[in-house]
A protein has these predicted regions:
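Beta-sheet-dominated interaction scaffolds and their linkers
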Residues: 46-75, 189-198, 233
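N-terminal signal peptide c-region/cleavage motif recognized by signal peptidases
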Residues: 40-42
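Asparagine-centered strand-capping/turn motif at beta-strand->loop junctions
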Residues: 69-73, 130, 203-211
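Intrinsically disordered, low-complexity segments enriched in serine, threonine, and glycine
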Residues: 193, 197-269
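Intrinsically disordered, low-complexity Pro/Gly/Ser/Thr-rich segments with frequent PxxP/GP/PP motifs
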Residues: 99-133, 226-251
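Terminal connector regions
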Residues: 131-190, 252-269
Length: 269
């Protein structure tokens, strides 16, 4: 199914670009820190991060969110957390505004701690605190990047400990994988209004509210829950319209998510 983009709507393609480490990497945002290959016969202990969901939503009236970072590997993970604000001003791609170099009082979103030491088979948590204005919806990208610790880089390890850790990873061909997640900060007085129209097989969805809506498990089927295409997920920002082509003999089926509300949608015509 081919989708036409109207008014530069934000969808999974935009989110892929927003998450990319180098504007060409798509989910799950693998970041090669040491090597390009991992040979099973040469594999040694290495960290394996799991940051949970790639999308988080800070609803109206809430200012904090706890995000858990798990390490399923056999080696301790030293993780740096970086934050950029994604400013969508009508261009083809969002503009990135780094927050890491700003003074604490100038940051709309504060991540604490910004350095994590996650033990093997263990878990640590980061606290997201939003302190900025909520006159409109705002968007932030967080990067969780495993690194080789160095003296004085905030991990409070000695030079000998850092060298020992580096040597343990260099013993084989290892891969350190980093991940990016996206945070949606809802505005005050959040309002949802999402008219949906289907005609001649084409589905048109418009977001007339002031917060992003999600079309989850989106697919076209021969009939409800029968012979369906692979499901996709689309985020539609306020003021945007998205048109999906389709066949009149088939149905569009998805879950419309407006904040905490969920609506099962099956559309014909």
């Amino acid at each position: 199914m081919r989708a036409k983009d109207h008014n530069r709507s934000i969808d999974a393609d935009w989110l892929s670009r927003a998450f990319c480490y180098e504007d060409s990497v798509v989910k799950p945002l693998r970041y090669f820190c040491l090597a390009l290959a991992l040979l099973p016969c040469m594999a040694h202990a290495a960290p394996e991060l799991n940051v949970g969901g790639l999308y988080d939503y800070l609803e109206e009236g809430k200012s904090t969110l706890l995000k858990r970072v798990r390490n399923g590997g056999d080696s301790t993970a030293f993780v740096k957390v970086s934050v950029v604000e994604l400013v969508y001003d009508g261009s083809a791609a969002p503009r990135e505004v780094p927050l890491d170099g700003l003074a604490l009082e100038q940051r709309g979103l504060v991540v604490s701690p910004a350095r994590l030491i996650v033990p093997a088979r263990g878990m640590q948590a980061v606290r997201l605190l939003y302190r900025g204005e909520r006159d409109k919806e705002r968007y932030y990208r967080l990067r969780f990047i495993p690194v080789l610790p160095e003296l004085g880089d905030g991990f409070a390890v000695s030079e000998a400990e850092a060298e020992q850790y580096r040597d343990s990873l260099k013993a084989g061909v290892n891969l350190l994988a980093g991940y990016g997640t996206l945070l949606f900060v809802r505005p005050d007085q959040t309002r949802y209004e999402t008219p949906i129209r289907r005609q001649g097989g084409a589905l048109t969805v418009t977001n007339q509210g002031n917060a992003t809506v999600v079309l989850d498990h989106f697919r076209q089927c021969q009939a409800q829950d029968q012979v369906c295409e692979p499901a996709t997920k689309h985020h539609l920002l306020p003021g945007r319209t998205r048109k999906f082509e389709g066949q009149a003999a088939k149905v569009h089926q998805f879950e419309l998510q407006e904040g905490s509300e969920r609506k099962a949608m099956v559309l014909e015509g």
